[in-house]
Every structure is written in structure tokens, then in C-alpha cells.
Amino acid sequence: MVTRDETAEAEGLRPAVGSSRVRTYQVRTYGCQMNVHDSERLSGLLESAGYQRAAEGTDADIVVFNTCAVRENADNKLYGNLSHLAPRKQADPNMQIAVGGCLAQKDRDAVLRRAPWVDVVFGTHNIGSLPTLLERARHNREAQVEIVEALQEFPSALPASRESAYAAWVSISVGCNNTCTFCIVPSLRGKEVDRRPGDILAEVQSLVDQGVLEITLLGQNVNAYGVSFADPELPRDRGAFAKLLRACGGIDGLERVRFTSPHPAEFTDDVIEAMAATPNVCPTLHMPLQSGSDRILKAMRRSYRAERFLGIIDKVRAAIPHAAITTDLIVGFPGETEEDFQATLDVVEQARFAGAFTFQYSKRPGTPAADMPDQLPKSVVTERYQRLIELQERISLEQNREQVGRAVELLVATGEGRKDASTARMSGRARDGRLVHFLPGDNEIRPGDIVTTTVTGAAPHHLIADAPIIERRRTRAGDAHAAGQKPRTGVGLGMPRIGAPAPSATAEGCGC
């Protein structure tokens, strides 16, 4: 294992050493929204260091895997893909493979034991080291493994190459102070570290200046925001997240604000008040339930109970009547009885979720739940999972049918859901987050534009709007998407940058 070299600097590194050809890269992302945004940062780092994104369908000189360790098949997926690259690596020793993210943080040296052709292994706390590690591996002709145990300061200085011209992730924190027994994330991403509000708002402003219309505030537990920079001598200000939402409401040109994910135990009334009072905060809430059984919630070490969860939903709907509420659910947690599972079905029925991400419990080594007795047979978990899916699909369809006849404002998107090509429908997201497939008619509509149309049909996972367009608005985001331009950010906290300086956020041609 190669230890971290504190004196190594990526500044000025160029990947085409000894060659006039610019080397290309590809980032493959597995897992949650955190990983998606981390991959944008990895792309920004590589581009700042002189690499170029590989064209679609071409072989990249550098392949970076940004991994997930939450699901049971994460290992198989990674090592299967690494095996597919082994012949390419053998044929072209100058090709490089890097593995980062949660699985790399967890497995460390095991990655090289199982796939010795990998060049770089890096963790969740040092993604900024990637250009340096790649160059060092090439120069030394030796694999580099660098894992940092803890994040001391939020890495706001890292540039990001965004995937969308119209919508963007903005991290407000990393890590988590909760200790859910099924979750390995806190041990891999560490304790919560929050960004200062000024740095968050500066990044949001930079994105809006480039034409971005929608931002999603991102954290493992967004409504615990502020805990890491609170004065330990003073009572904790639990209103920091609500204040942040209201501050986003004051940014001209920012049309939509979303956030994910809150924790029910930390959810306070001031957040609901801020959601209702801030016009650009979208009428939607994604809040993980995980189980409707109080006994299982206790075993999961989730510090709330079903009654509190349902109480929060009631308050949200009282303040924001048309809010779309979604959740996460786990089926088959160790020791879950039929009675426990029925409690989950009962809460789902009462909550009337617009949608739910449902998971079969996945045993993860290193978590307390993995060592619990009464692990359920796969057949039982699968049968319960199917019953839960059937219930939620029915509720989702009923909820979506209530939207038929309503006018909806859509932010036109690309790559959203499956559409029948023969209908020539486009897709967009309503303000409440629902996916809508709509007919553009004779209008020239681009991803990033805003349209208003009428819902004419419903399915469990989407709405149909085949009515004529009521209104359309061309946007700078639409202009940028059409021109192939995407925003870049690199808002700093005084930390040294990696690689060449990122372009100015207001540089001509960014128009997105």
C-alpha cells in the first residue's frame, strides 16, 4: 500500500506527458445522489487537469469507478466490470483504471488483491487526489492506494463538471451522525461535516448565473444541517436548515429548490414553515420511513416511531395541501414478523405516498444488523416485497389519477423514463417532482425550457399530458442544452485547488 504523500501537488499536472494526444476519461457511477454528485466533481477534477471526456461509445484511456457499498450485489457488479476491462488493460498498459467511492473506502487493499490490474484506489474523503494518484501510478508504474480516514473540512474547492444545464446538485453536508443498524454509510463517509451557508449560497448563485433553474440541496440528513459548525458552548441552532431554504428563496432566477434526504427524528416545524413560505421551494418531500413497525424501527436504531412520521406528513399536507410525499422502505429486516410487515403496510396505506423506493433488506458485513439473529429466508422477503410493491403501485396510481385535468408547469428534461417513440412525447418534471410525458405539438421545445400543459392520463410512475401546450418559455438553460454547454463550479473555502484553475462561473458561453 502506498501511503499518502502530503507534499504531492496536482497543480500543473498534465495527463499527456510524453504525448501530444489528450487522454480521455470515463466515470462510471453506482449508488446514491451523493455518488452522482461526487462523479461530477471527479469529472471536473480530471478536466481541470487536462483530461477530456471520452465520446459516447468509445474506449477511454482512463476508466474511473465511483462505487457504492450499500447494496448486496455492489461487490459483484464492480468486480464483474473490472474483469471485463482486464483484457483491454493487458493489451494497452497505458490505459488506467481507478476505483473510488464507498466500496473502495471499505475494501481498500482487497481491491488490488481481487483485481491487481487496477492502477488507483481512493476513498470517499480524498477524491481531490485522483489526478495526482493517476500521474504517480503512471510515473512509478505501481498501483497507488490512498484512503483518508476522516474529512476535516468540506471540500468546496473541488471543481465540478455538471451533467445538466438546467438542474444541479448542491451538497450542504457530507457524512452522518446517525447509527442505523442496517447502514454502512457513516463508517465510510464519516461524521457529518457541514458547509458554511455563504459557501452553499455562493455555489447556488454561480449555478443560477450560468442559467441553472433548479437545485437540489444534498446531504445524508439535511435537517441536521449546522451541527458541525455550531458553537459547542451555545445551545444548538436547530433552525439552520430552514434559514438556508429561506435564503435560497432570495436568489433571483432560481425557480426550483428541492432537498434530500431529511430524517424524521430531526424534522422540525420551522422547515415546514420555510417550505410553505418560500415560493421557489417545491411542494415535495422525500422522507425515509424504512419500516412502519415501531419494534423494527427500534431494532434499526431509527429514533422515531410511526406515529411521529405520520404526524410530520399531516403537518406538511396542512401547510402545503398538494405536496407529493415519497419515501424509502426496507422489507425483510432481521426479525421482521408478519405482524411487523403488516404494520408497514398499514402506515403506507395511511401515508398515501406518491411513490416509494422499496428495497429488500441487504446484509452488509460491518453493520450491526448483519450479526443479528433471525435473518429472514429470501423467499419470505421476496413475497413480502411483492405485496408491498402491489400496494404502493395501487396508491401511486390513485394519487396520479387525481392529477388528471390539472395544469402543470414542467421543467423539460432529457433521459427521463421510458416513452413510446411513436408518440414523439417529451418528458419533464412537475414542481412536485412527478414525471410527466407530454406532447410538444408544433412547438420547438428543448430540455431546460419551461412548459405548462394539462394532465390527460396517469400510470403508477408517471403522468401523460397529450393536451395542447398552454404556455412555453424559452430559457437560458434551454439555450445552453441546445449548445451542449454545461455549468461548472468550483466555489472555494480557502482550500488549495487541484489541477488547473476552473473557468470563471460567468465566463462567456456558459449561458446555462
UniProtKB/Swiss-Prot annotation:
UniProt region (Disordered), positions on chain: 477-512
Radical SAM core domain ranges (all copies): 162-398
Entry note: cofactor: Binds 2 [4Fe-4S] clusters. One cluster is coordinated with 3 cysteines and an exchangeable S-adenosyl-L-methionine.
Pfam family for this entry, one: Radical_SAM
Cofactor: [4Fe-4S] cluster
Occurrences of domain TRAM (ranges): 401-469
EC number: 2.8.4.3
Enzyme class: transferase
Residues binding [4Fe-4S] cluster 2, per UniProt: C176, C180, C183
Localization of this protein: Cytoplasm
Ranges for domain MTTase N-terminal: 23-139
Binding site for [4Fe-4S] cluster 1: C32, C68, C102
Catalytic activity: N(6)-dimethylallyladenosine(37) in tRNA + (sulfur carrier)-SH + AH2 + 2 S-adenosyl-L-methionine = 2-methylsulfanyl-N(6)-dimethylallyladenosine(37) in tRNA + (sulfur carrier)-H + 5'-deoxyadenosine + L-methionine + A + S-adenosyl-L-homocysteine + 2 H(+)
Single GO molecular function: 4 iron, 4 sulfur cluster binding
Keywords for this protein: 4Fe-4S, Cytoplasm, Iron, Iron-sulfur, Metal-binding, S-adenosyl-L-methionine, Transferase, tRNA processing
Key word NADP present: no
Superkingdom per UniProt: Bacteria
Keyword tRNA processing: yes
Membrane-spanning parts: none
Described purpose of this protein according to its UniProt entry: Catalyzes the methylthiolation of N6-(dimethylallyl)adenosine (i(6)A), leading to the formation of 2-methylthio-N6-(dimethylallyl)adenosine (ms(2)i(6)A) at position 37 in tRNAs that read codons beginning with uridine.
Family the entry assigns: Belongs to the methylthiotransferase family. MiaB subfamily.
Subunit structure, as described in the record: Monomer.
Protein name: tRNA-2-methylthio-N(6)-dimethylallyladenosine synthase
Organism (species): Mycolicibacterium smegmatis (strain ATCC 700084 / mc(2)155)
